[in-house]
Structures are given as C-alpha cells and as structure tokens.
Amino acid sequence: MKNAHDLVLEAKAQIHEVALEDAEAAIRAADQLLDVREADEFHAGHIPGAINIPRGVLEFKLSNDPALCARELNIVLYCKTSGRAALAACSLQAMGYRQVQSLAGGFDAWSAAGKAQVAANLPNFE
C-alpha cells in the first residue's frame, strides 16, 4: 500500500523541479507564482509576488478563474518543503497545463537561503 511519501516521489518523477539556485530566474519568467500552502502558512511569510491557493482547492480555483485557466501559463508552485507543490504540479499537468515547475525544497529552502520574503504583518501593541 502506498503512503503520502510514495505519492510525492511518484509526482516528483513526473514533474520539473526548479533548483533553488535557478528559482529567482524561473519566478521572474513565470506568469504566476502560486503558494499552495494553507492560508495561515502563507500569512506567516511568503515569496514576494506569490498568490495563495491552498492545495486542497487548487484545481477548482484554476478552473473557475479566467486569469488562471489558460493552459499556456508559465506557473511556478511552492509549498513548505516541496511535497504538496509536487502533487499540485502533477495535477496541473494532468489538467493540460504545459509549463509547470515546482520549487525544490519549498519555502523552507527559500527562507534558509536568505532569499526575499514577505514577512508576517503582526500588530504592534506597544
């Protein structure tokens, strides 16, 4: 019986993962940068320019948003460590999207490398 890790490994074998050192160029070339983490994760910090569409609703949102339904869009996806993004990339390819990439290592790798991010906007009570 397969587990989640097995499914992620299978997905990664079918998609293109962009290496961290190539990520900024891939993001600049992309039409859309999608963060597929949950909303609370996104609000805690994310890559500049990303829009948040959680993995659980991704296919529905893309199908119903005229700006996102064009199959020729160049899309870069990321999540926390790259598992959800790999599964999402596999789904988008199955939907007919032809230019889909997943960020290897996800937001954790991006953050650990000291790359630019939008930090949480927490209230200051002082």
Task: Locate each region found by the language model.
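Rhodanese-like catalytic fold shared by cysteine-dependent sulfurtransferases
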Residues: 1-32, 39-74, 83-126
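Short, surface-exposed ligand- or partner-binding patches at beta-edge/loop junctions that are enriched
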Residues: 78
